[in-house]
């Protein structure tokens, strides 16, 4: 069922790195009542993420990097273990993820498989993330990875079982990473 939405005002509060909007809108409820809402919405663009896995070695490739938002929210070191990811900018999701994989992990991926698209924080963030997986092998390692000039990324090749355990221990706390690791487990690609 489609609800009627009328935009009243869209005020840009910040357009520094991403865009923060203050949006006022009227929402017509199912019973016909019109309710006025005022919300802040953070537009950071859409993104893509990929989990690299090796079924023969039973390993996955993840990265560790500083994430300021986690630091602000109590992660003492600010370090987060996660899947390779990036913003689309003007690229198609598959093009983006191939670029990010080589930059961040050093692996030049072959065939990729798109799984799904998800909003990760739809209450206030516009970002839609495209989720991919790809099998990798040692001979696909083109460089050391580590990201571009302003990034400081550590590449982690981990046993799949250890990565799953790291979810339980709280060492992996990134939503997209947990989703992809759980997908890999339930799909039985590592059996």
Curated annotation (Swiss-Prot):
It is an enzyme of class 3 (hydrolase). SUPFAM superfamilies: Nudix. The keyword Transferase does not apply. GO terms for cellular component: cytosol. GDP-alpha-D-mannose binds at residues 17, 38-40, 67, 85-87, 104, 127, 150-151, 176. GO terms for molecular function: hydrolase activity, acting on acid anhydrides, in phosphorus-containing anhydrides; metal ion binding. It catalyses: GDP-alpha-D-mannose + H2O = alpha-D-mannose 1-phosphate + GMP + 2 H(+). Its EC number is 3.6.1.-. GO terms for biological process: nucleoside phosphate metabolic process; ribose phosphate metabolic process. Its cofactor is Mg(2+). Keywords: Hydrolase, Magnesium, Metal-binding. Residues 43-180 form the Nudix hydrolase domain. A motif (Nudix box) lies at residues 86-106. Signal peptide: none annotated. Mg(2+) 1 binds at residues 85, 104. Mg(2+) 2 binds at residues 100, 104, 151. Homodimer. Nucleoside diphosphate sugar hydrolase that hydrolyzes GDP-mannose as its preferred substrate, yielding GMP and mannose-1-phosphate. Belongs to the Nudix hydrolase family. NudK subfamily. NCBIfam families: nudix-type nucleoside diphosphatase, YffH/AdpP family, PRK15009.1. In the dimer, the N-terminal domains are swapped between the two monomers, such that residues of both chains contribute to the active site. This is GDP-mannose pyrophosphatase.
């Amino acid at each position: 069922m489609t609800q009627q939405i009328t935009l009243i005002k869209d005020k840009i509060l910040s357009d520094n790195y991403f865009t923060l909007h203050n949006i006022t809108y009227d929402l017509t409820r199912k019973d016909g009542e019109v309710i006025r809402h005022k919300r802040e919405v953070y537009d950071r663009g859409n993104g893509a993420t990929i989990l690299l896995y090796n079924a023969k070695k039973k390993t996955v490739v993840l990265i560790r990097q500083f994430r300021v938002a986690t630091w602000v929210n109590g992660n003492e070191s600010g370090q987060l273990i996660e899947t390779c990811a990036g913003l689309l900018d003007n690229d198609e999701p598959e093009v983006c993820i191939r670029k990010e994989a080589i930059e961040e992990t050093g692996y030049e991926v072959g065939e990729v498989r798109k799984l799904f698209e998800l909003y990760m924080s739809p209450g206030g963030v516009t970002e839609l993330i495209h989720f991919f997986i790809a099998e990798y092998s040692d001979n696909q390692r083109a460089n050391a990875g580590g990201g571009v000039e302003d990034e400081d990324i550590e590449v982690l090749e981990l046993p799949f079982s250890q990565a799953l355990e790291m979810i339980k221990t709280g060492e992996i706390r990134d939503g997209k990473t947990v989703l992809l690791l759980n997908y890999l487990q339930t799909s039985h690609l590592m059996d």
